[in-house]
Amino acid sequence: VFTDASGAPSSFEYSLTGSCTAYYAPAGAVTSIGATPQVGYVAVDPNRIPYGSLLYITAVDGSWTYGYCYAMDTGGAAMCGDIVADLYYDTLEDCTAFGRRDMIVYVVRAGW
């Protein structure tokens, strides 16, 4: 059980801890499953975190919370094992502010 940003306890199936990065995409882009990228969608290695999984992502040190989101894209660095997830943001500035952080990715519900 983890406690989300609202203070509510939540159960999860499993968690992964490691580096996460951020990305954004130009207008008209689509994710690897054909969805329009948006805040709340993240890129993962679908062999570790299935597409459609409901996730909750927060910093190991508690300094940053991405919150509840869905595994909706494939991340090249995630496929290589370099990161756990690539978090979508609307702007380059938001991505730069996030940078690269050690995060806990809670898999609340695996898959669709």
Regions found by a protein language model. Name each.
Residues 1-112:
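Solvent-exposed, well-ordered loop and adjacent helix/strand elements within mature globular domains
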